[in-house]
Regions:
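C-terminal lobe/lid and adjacent interdomain/linker elements of RecA-like ASCE P-loop ATPase modules
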Residues: 1, 258-337
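Conserved beta-strand scaffold positions in the cores of enzyme catalytic domains, especially
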Residues: 21, 120-123, 291-293, 303
Length: 337
């Protein structure tokens, strides 16, 4: 049984001074203006996961040292405190900065499966779609156990699904069908292994309807390859208990954003989904209760889940079709309060 996050508390972490007993649902669409703290909320998931994976101090060192994680720095904040409740189990910690720019860690656990759930969290970021991006390169066929955060192993992962028995094949076919909705000319992935010395590698080759010519990853637009990665993450047969996706809307056509929303909804039956976005079109696809507004309040990040009392105002915004700044302002995202 998947262990989703029911509630979380985090204090003193970056722009998040005090977020207490905040509830997460199956779908959590976090929207806010630049600087509201969405990225810090996303990074919190990475940090907690690395604590459980025992790679925490290296994570802190490579991201600026302890002071970079404390709300307004060492002088303002003496520690970071957090607690996560997952299906009746819990994990909490206190982080106290040390003289060598690391943290002294005090942890508490209640439950046998909490470490497995947290260590499996994945924060997907498919921002780099450049010609040299990992997702466009060849990767060894053995790198297929799970989809990497930057989709560097998208080709071997898809190849493994296609050869993984009924469950994997079903997932693979669903991914292909989703891609065809966005790219009607798309036929299938080729994924033909090529030997490089002692290793076999595969890259994201594909075919177009009406021809067997093997198109290369560089033939895919930024939006197309990003959507392939998103569809794969959301339709994978054995997802982690919680997945976080940072700004999935980048480079996507409005029609693709609507299809993405359908994939998120379908995935939420099997995994908890947290999405950080600036896209009003993406937000507009979800129920009011799925939306979490991030804004600055008294110099810190505040998160607020919308409810039915907000629905009338949102419906008015939709009818008026405001631009994004107006839309954010009316939600309270652009105001320092």
């Amino acid at each position: 049984m998947r262990k989703k996050i029911d509630r979380l508390t985090i204090k003193g972490f970056k722009s998040i001074r005090d977020l207490s007993n905040f509830s997460l649902g199956d779908i959590n669409i976090v929207v806010g203006a630049n600087g509201a703290g969405k990225s810090n909320f996303v990074q919190m998931f990475r940090m907690v996961r690395e604590m459980v994976r025992k790679d925490f101090q290296n994570f802190i060192a490579t991201h600026g040292g302890a002071a970079a994680f404390l709300h307004n720095g060492l002088k303002a904040t003496k520690s970071i405190e957090a607690e996560f409740n997952l299906g009746g189990e819990s994990y909490g910690f206190t982080l106290t900065p040390t003289a060598d720019e690391t943290f002294a860690v005090s942890e508490s656990r209640n439950g046998e499966n909490v470490d497995d759930a947290i260590s499996g969290w994945v924060v997907y970021h498919f921002h780099d779609t450049s010609e040299r991006s990992p997702m466009r390169q060849s990767e060894i066929v053995e790198d297929c156990a799970y989809l990497r955060e930057d989709a560097a192993n998208i080709a071997p992962f898809l190849k493994a699904l296609r050869e993984d028995g009924p469950e994997g094949i079903k997932s693979y076919r669903e991914i292909v069908a989703a891609v065809r909705l966005v790219m009607p000319f798309f036929d299938d992935f080729a994924l033909t292994p090529v030997r490089f010395g002692p290793a076999e590698k595969v890259k994201l080759t594909w075919t177009q309807k009406g021809t067997d010519y093997p198109f290369q990853p560089y033939h895919l637009s930024d939006g197309a390859i990003r959507f392939i990665c998103l569809a794969t993450a959301l339709l994978q047969p054995r997802p982690p208990s919680t997945i976080v996706i940072d700004e999935p809307e980048l480079g996507l056509h409005p029609q693709a954003i609507a299809i993405l929303a359908d994939l998120i909804k379908a995935a939420s039956a099997r995994t908890q989904v947290v999405v950080a976005t600036q896209s009003p079109l993406l937000v507009d696809q979800f129920a009011v209760g799925d939306i979490v507004v991030a804004k600055r309040k008294d110099g810190a990040t505040a998160l607020e889940r919308l409810d039915e009392k907000d629905k009338i105002g949102i419906d008015k915004m939709r009818a008026a079709n405001p631009n994004f700044d107006d839309w954010l302002t009316r939600l309270g995202c652009n105001r320092e309060s």
